[in-house]
Every structure is written in C-alpha cells, then in structure tokens.
C-alpha cells in the first residue's frame, strides 16, 4: 500500500467526519497531513522541479484559521452555557465563567424611601419577614434591599454609639486630670515639709525633756561638782565664794574667769595652777 494514499484516505476521512472543507492545493502539489496541519511550501530541487515539504512558513496561514470564530468576542458570549443566572428573592445574581458572583450596581434610594425606612427603623431595628415584605412592596423595593439597608443602619448606629462613649470617657479623664493638683517631685515635697515645720517647737521640746531628766542644781551642787559642766555651763559666782579672782575650776586646763572690780564683771582667761 502506498503511504501517500493512506495519508490521503485518513485526511479525507478526517475532513468528512469533521465537516470542514479541506484546504485547496496551491498548484505546486502540496499536501496536508492530519498530523502536521500546515501547508507545504514549494521547494526547488536540483533538477528544477518543485517538491513538497511538511513544514510550513510563518507567513502562510495555519490550519487553525479554517475554523470560524465564535459568535462573540467575550467568553460569556462565546460560551453562554457557562454563565448562570440565580434569582434570589426577586433579584437576579449573575456569575461569571470562574464562578464568582458579579457585583451589582449600588442601590440609590430616593428621599421618600429613605424617610419611610428611617421612620420604620425608629420603631424597630429588626423586621420580621411579613413586615419586611410589606415594607418592600410599599416602597417598591426588593426584600433584599430593605434587609441590607437595615443591616447598614444598625452597624452605623453601633459605630456612632461607640464613638460617643469613647469621646465621653476622654472628657471625663480630662476633667479628673484638671481637678487633681499638681504634686511636686519627691525632693521638693520633703524640703517643703521641713521648711514648714517650726524649728522653735523642736528646740522647746528638747529643753523640756532635758529639764525633766536633769532638774536644776543648787549653787552648792554646782560648786561641789564643777567637772560635770564645761565652760559653756559655767555659772557666775559672787565674789564672796573665796576663789582666786572669782574663777571657776575647769578640768580642761583652760577656763574662763570673771573678775569683779568696782561692781563690774570682767571676763579673763587664765590657767589655774
């Protein structure tokens, strides 16, 4: 069996079953193979005769050009069976080829519809199915549109309440902060307390404690025990005591003395031997 006849038979059977007209020859004896659907271009042989080749040039038309284009340019028009329409409560929802729902245009309510919806929302924030159907029929809207409007209105009211409560709490915090007096730092507060306390009261309390612990001594006791006192606690004695130049005995070695001359006490400092 000749291979070329076999290819011609198969090619003829292919075009007969597919219903597509086979390509015409270009006069150069070119054939079309079902396995390589490209037109052959003529090539010159060594003897000047033209021969056929299975590979076509890019300039020539491909075998896919024989198929007619679809009825439309878009996938929905070319494949209408892939576009579905779903009816939900009187509203049509279309889906594209990928199965995603096509977004509908936003509903615009007129002033009378908004007034009726707002009035109904003030009475009740949630509508039952009969009430929603009656309101939608009265306003000329679908039940889905009425339901969506009520949902949006409830969310808007919640946002407004949340913003008002946050604003009120911020104002209360500001008022409490303004009413509180400014407290100075730790170091300044300690200095203020120390300066505010009277020093005379502290010194007077110390004196009273000393008087209670050490009662005042008589003149003889002071004379008998002068070593208990320093030069700061020296007592002026009258000149009749018989000390040299009226001086008090001081164990420190140096002690003040008081001279009584012409009725006037004169302070001198000398060492008693």
Curated annotation (Swiss-Prot):
Residues 102-161 bind DNA. One of its GO terms (molecular function) is RNA polymerase II cis-regulatory region sequence-specific DNA binding. The keyword DNA-binding applies. CDD domains: homeodomain (cd00086). Probable transcription factor. Binds to the sequence motif 5'-ATAAT-3' in regulatory elements. Required for development of the anterior hypodermis during embryonic morphogenesis for cell adhesion; also affects embryonic and larval viability. Modulates and maintains dopaminergic neuron differentiation. May activate dopamine pathway genes in concert with ETS domain-containing protein ast-1, and homeobox proteins ceh-40 and ceh-20. It is found in: Nucleus. Predominantly expressed in the head hypdodermis, neuronal support cells and CAN neurons. It comes from Caenorhabditis elegans. One of its GO terms (cellular component) is nucleus. Its main location: nucleus. Belongs to the distal-less homeobox family. SMART domains: HOX. This is Homeobox protein ceh-43. Signal peptide: none annotated. Gene3D superfamilies: Homeodomain-like. Keywords: DNA-binding, Homeobox, Nucleus.
């Amino acid at each position: 069996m000749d291979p070329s006849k076999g290819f011609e038979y198969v090619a003829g059977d292919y075009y007969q079953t597919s219903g597509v007209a086979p390509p015409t020859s270009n006069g150069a004896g070119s054939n079309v193979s079902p396995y390589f659907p490209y037109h052959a271009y003529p090539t010159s042989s060594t003897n000047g005769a033209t021969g056929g080749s299975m590979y076509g040039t890019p300039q020539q038309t491909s075998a896919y050009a024989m198929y007619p284009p679809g009825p439309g340019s878009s996938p929905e028009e070319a494949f209408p069976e892939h576009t579905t329409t779903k009816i939900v409560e009187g509203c049509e929802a279309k889906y594209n080829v990928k199965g995603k729902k096509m977004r509908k245009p936003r509903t615009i309510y007129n002033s009378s519809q908004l007034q009726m919806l707002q009035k109904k929302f003030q009475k009740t924030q949630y509508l039952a199915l009969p009430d929603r159907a009656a309101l939608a029929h009265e306003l000329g809207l679908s039940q889905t549109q009425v339901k969506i409007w009520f949902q949006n209105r409830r969310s808007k009211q919640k946002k407004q309440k949340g913003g008002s409560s946050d604003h009120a709490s911020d104002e209360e915090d500001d008022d409490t902060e303004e009413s509180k007096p400014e407290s100075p730092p730790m170091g300044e507060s300690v200095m203020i307390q120390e300066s505010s306390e009277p020093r005379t009261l502290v010194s007077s309390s110390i004196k009273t404690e000393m008087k209670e612990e050490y009662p005042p001594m008589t003149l003889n006791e002071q004379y008998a025990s002068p070593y208990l006192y320093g030069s700061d606690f020296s007592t002026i004695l009258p000149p009749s005591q018989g000390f040299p130049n009226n001086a008090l005995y001081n164990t420190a070695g140096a002690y003040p003395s008081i001279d009584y001359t012409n009725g006037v006490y004169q302070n001198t400092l000398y060492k008693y031997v």
